[in-house]
Amino acid sequence: MTSTVNQSLDDFMGRFAAFVKEHAEAGAIEYDEDWPSPCYATDVTPESGTSIPWKPVLREQTSEFKDLSEALELTLHPDVAQFYSRYWSDNIVAQHPSGKLQILQAWNEEDFERLQQNIVGHILMKRRLRQPETIFIALTDEDDFVLSVDNQTGAVMLEQVGLQPKEQISPDLATFLDEIEPTTTD
């Protein structure tokens, strides 16, 4: 039986929660009163500029990216919609057999809107360059390289921004999420 993106993402977030118990710095963020999020710990009294605990939070409503899909006249791969609309979360540093990366997530509604705008820009660039449409999901340690999902096949690809995807990293997003482990930024 194949794993769904939601289940694989839930499992990864569970691994992240366990990791934070051993590496508290991975679950701490500088509090910004102008950048609200349900991810901030609720058992502390935050002050701007201080480091406080945070954790990924399941979203109450998911998004199917309907407006984005209509604007681009494109059906967004359902794995990507699940990936980006399941949790509110800061980006999470992780290790994959192919290297270190940073999983991209949305911190709040404003961040989610910005994410969608960036996806639109990325897809329009891919169209202008007459390349397969991809949607980025992670940053890598290599400059100008991202991990993206091929919108047709659902495969996770390594691609240099502006160029064709370089290589397949995982056959699908659920498998990719099963293959990564949280790590520290060092």
Curated annotation (Swiss-Prot):
A GO-annotated cellular component: cytoplasmic side of plasma membrane
InterPro entries on file: Syd (IPR009948), Syd_sf (IPR038228)
Keywords: Cell inner membrane, Cell membrane, Membrane
Annotated compartments: Cell inner membrane
Main localization of the protein described in the UniProt heading: membrane
Membrane topology qualifier: Peripheral membrane protein
CDD domains in alphabetical order: Syd
Family according to the record: Belongs to the Syd family.
Role description: Interacts with the SecY protein in vivo. May bind preferentially to an uncomplexed state of SecY, thus functioning either as a chelating agent for excess SecY in the cell or as a regulatory factor that negatively controls the translocase function.
Protein name: Protein Syd
UniProt source species: Pseudoalteromonas atlantica (strain T6c / ATCC BAA-1087)
Taxon lineage: Bacteria, Pseudomonadati, Pseudomonadota, Gammaproteobacteria, Alteromonadales
Gene field: syd
